Amino acid sequence: MRVDGRISGARKMRIVQAKRAGLKTLTMLGIVLLLTGCAGVNLNPLEWFNSDEEVNPPKELVDISAEIRLDRLWSVDVGNGQGDNYTEITPAIAGRVIFAASENGTVLAVNLDSGDVLWRNRLDERLIPGGVGAGGGLVIVGSRDAEVIALDQSTGETVWIGQVTSEVVAQPIANEDIVVVQTVDDKVTALDNVSGEQRWIYESTQPPLTLRGTSRPVFTPADTVVAGFSNGTLVSVSADDGVWRWEERVAVPEGRYDIDRVIDIDGDLVLDGNRIFASSYQGNLIALDVATGRIVWGLQDASSYHGITQGFGNLYYCSDESHVVAVRDESEDIVWRNEDLQHRSITAPTAISNYVAVADFEGYVHLISQIDGRIVGRSRVDDDGVRANLLADRGRLITFGNSGTLAAYSLQ
């Protein structure tokens, strides 16, 4: 067993539920020992407490008056999908092509309009733990062996293989100059776009216990890279050389035990002009000035390990209890909160047309009105569930189910 102090996805959800149920400190300490002693082992979360009884079971779905439906346009099988491990491999879009990968090393390119497979590359004996990146003419994935593999967007041929310090579970980002990856050991590394050689590395201080996952870094117009870390800080560094520009806390650790002090920034950041939005687990949702790091506004107790989306003048986030919340993007005012999907392990929200879309552990996609937060549409897209974030493209919704089915849907 590997001791690394990280909480994996299924365990992450179980921890949230256990904390919400108010379990005794002794029980929580036992969970910590389990996590730190067996990190990386694929366990069934329902067996944690040697009981068939679920802590905070997922809320049952109720009938809705559907105002919108999903019609499937095309679908493609992508290897073994999310595989047997708790991965969250999200595809990436560049131009009119979507790039997807499976946990067992299949990477492919699909025409967004027709669903035709343009190329397929099987990365032999490599397991992919995280999302796909696309930019600067490359498709980038990471391996469990701390490799970064860059493929040509047009052909799928391997351009280079770089080495980083740990596995990459967040989507890489890339431009014509560099590829930037964030690894689970809280390091951000820039690799040369052409050669794959390391250009710079930025390292943050990692707490004793963290959630397994990282947020995706973002490029800014100020020629910087902004990244969120497991110690609850948001950091801006120069894209040219990795030199520190500014740092600000999204959350402050509180509590006596390590598990109470987990404040990871795991969800993707949102860049909007001169502002950047971030949220943290057991922390806050904040808006900062991207040039200076100055906090513009903050919403306290907005615990989330998912990303944020934007639409209709609102920010949308999913809480650690799978509540979907709308907040004004100019202030911390809450517009609405939907608790109908409580504990259903929903994905990060995606804004599409007049709706916010999320998917859950049973494979249902829920369409929520951006205006009042009602669920107005529901379709099941994968019997094995959906963990990958949904994508929006020209009014169509792209899903990547756990079984490996990549599909595009129109809203009718």
What is the meaning of each model-derived region?
Residues 35-37:
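C-terminal motif of bacterial Sec signal peptides marking the signal peptidase cleavage site
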Residues 314-326, 333-367:
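Loop/turn-rich, solvent-exposed surfaces of beta-rich toroidal or solenoidal domains
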Residues 41-46, 52, 67-92, 120-135, ...:
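Extracytoplasmic beta-rich repeat domains
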Residues 111-114, 152-155, 192-195, 239-241, ...:
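Short loop/turn segments that connect beta-strands within beta-propeller blades
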